[in-house]
């Protein structure tokens, strides 16, 4: 998967199209990512010992990785991801600017 935790992405399809956020978690087996502030779902929580009031909580739900695009670190525009070997290590590069993408976990 070309998106990693800590990456800044833009949603390119779906109900939250146009929103930007940071990737909180990746789910590689399901090809999904959880993005901060995107795809907010309401979860009805029963009262428990930890949360005696219960109520309705809002949390981010996962969206398919094909619906997000990585933001170029140089221009802050959506870009595709390429790979290049630098000093024997495989690194991700932004296709638009050629800039190396560093994951900031």
UniProtKB/Swiss-Prot annotation:
- Domain of life, source organism: Bacteria
Q: Which SMART domains does the entry mention? A: KOW
Q: Which GO terms describe its molecular function?
A: rRNA binding; structural constituent of ribosome
Q: Cite a GO CC annotation.
A: cytosolic large ribosomal subunit
Assigned keywords, A-Z: Ribonucleoprotein, Ribosomal protein, RNA-binding, rRNA-binding
CDD domains cross-referenced by the UniProt entry: KOW_RPL26 (cd06089)
The record's Pfam families line, in alphabetical order, gives:
KOW (PF00467), ribosomal_L24 (PF17136)
* GO biological process entries: translation
Main function: One of two assembly initiator proteins, it binds directly to the 5'-end of the 23S rRNA, where it nucleates assembly of the 50S subunit.
Its family remark reads: Belongs to the universal ribosomal protein uL24 family.
Q: Mind telling me which PANTHER family this protein's record contains?
A: MITOCHONDRIAL RIBOSOMAL PROTEIN L24
Describe its partners and assembly state: Part of the 50S ribosomal subunit.
What is the official name of this protein in its record? Large ribosomal subunit protein uL24
Source organism per entry reads: Staphylococcus aureus (strain NCTC 8325 / PS 47)
């Amino acid at each position: 998967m070309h998106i990693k935790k800590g990456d800044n992405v833009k949603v390119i399809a779906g109900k939250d199209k146009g929103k930007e956020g940071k990737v909180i978690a990746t789910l590689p087996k399901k090809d999904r990512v959880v993005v901060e502030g995107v795809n907010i779902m309401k979860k009805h929580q029963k009262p428990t010992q930890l949360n005696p009031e219960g109520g309705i909580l809002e949390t981010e739900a996962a969206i398919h990785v094909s619906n997000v695009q990585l933001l170029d670190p140089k221009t802050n525009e959506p870009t595709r991801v390429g790979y290049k070997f630098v000093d024997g290590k495989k690194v991700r590069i932004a296709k638009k600017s050629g800039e190396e993408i560093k994951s900031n976990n």
